[in-house]
């Protein structure tokens, strides 16, 4: 079992495609493979939520005029791309719940994620080489503000 620490970040609504940027360094690395989570909080006895989410925490790259992509000072953004989790009580302890993907066969691709539980974010990294472009965003500065798109090529 690996303990996840809460992030000090305000979570955006899940309908917002890209959150404000964070520069919090990666903390916890979990092995690639099936995952489930256990949450312990005393108030879960009386107020456990019905669901939770895993959301992608994408690394942000700048889009320069050249084809090369430069990473933007280790900036990360929470995406709206998510996996829904079920919340079920742990029979041995009423203060604990187990969080599992709706699809029991789901294996997360390598990259950084945020577990969203009770409006709190907990980040972790699934070990391995990132191959899913959803984990990389290009940021282009425009007169109307920054625009984000998935990276055409992974850095």
Predicted segments, located by residue:
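Primarily secretory-pathway and cell-envelope proteins
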Residues: 1-78, 117-155
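Residues that flank catalytic or metal-binding motifs in active/ligand-binding sites
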Residues: 95, 109, 120
